[in-house]
Amino acid sequence: MRTLWIMAVLLVGVEGSLLEFGRMIKEETGKNPLFSYISYGCYCGWGGQGQPKDATDRCCFVHDCCYGKLWSCSPKTDIYFYYRKNGAIVCARGTWCEKQICECDKAAAICFRENLGTYKDEYQSYGKSRCTEKSLKC
């Protein structure tokens, strides 16, 4: 019950591209992004350290690196627009930053879909304190 309350509180503060990213994840994987990816492994969710636990966690590591290259943008709050054409995500309209944030999110959502077969429930709600190996560099 406490976990649900914490997630509800987090949702209240979520805006901008995080909502769009969540929708992309749901569309690509069929999974609820809050329950499946928000604290998966060592890199999914806020922050990241250590070694990615599996291919899904590596998607999050690469996503973090992608956001890191956008130092002049606000990836978690800038709102972007996307649509689907023949099933594919198309990042559309907006500023350079908005389009780049969308491309980062698109790549991660596709990566999650491509690695659904390696997704492990044991890495859901994985404590970052358990990620003690030397961190990777982007």
UniProtKB/Swiss-Prot annotation:
Annotated compartments: Secreted
Annotated cofactor note: Binds 1 Ca(2+) ion.
Tissues with expression: Expressed by the venom gland.
Name the cofactor(s): Ca(2+)
Reported EC number(s) for this entry are: 3.1.1.4
GO molecular function terms noted in the UniProt entry? calcium ion binding; calcium-dependent phospholipase A2 activity; phospholipid binding; toxin activity
Q: Which residues form the active site?
A: 63, 105
Q: What does the record list as GO biological process?
A: arachidonate secretion; lipid catabolic process; negative regulation of T cell proliferation; phospholipid metabolic process
State a GO cellular component annotated for this protein.
extracellular region
The reply on keyword Calcium is yes
Query: What's the superkingdom here?
Result: Eukaryota
Residues spanning the signal sequence: 1-16
Sorted alphabetically, which Gene3D superfamilies does this protein's record hold?
A: Phospholipase A2 domain (1.20.90.10)
Main enzyme class = hydrolase
Residue positions binding Ca(2+) = 43, 45, 47, 64
What SMART domains does the record point to? PA2c
- The question of whether Signal is a record keyword is answered with yes
Q: What is its main location?
A: secreted
Please give the family membership noted in the entry: Belongs to the phospholipase A2 family. Group II subfamily. D49 sub-subfamily.
This protein's name = Basic phospholipase A2 Tbo-G6D49
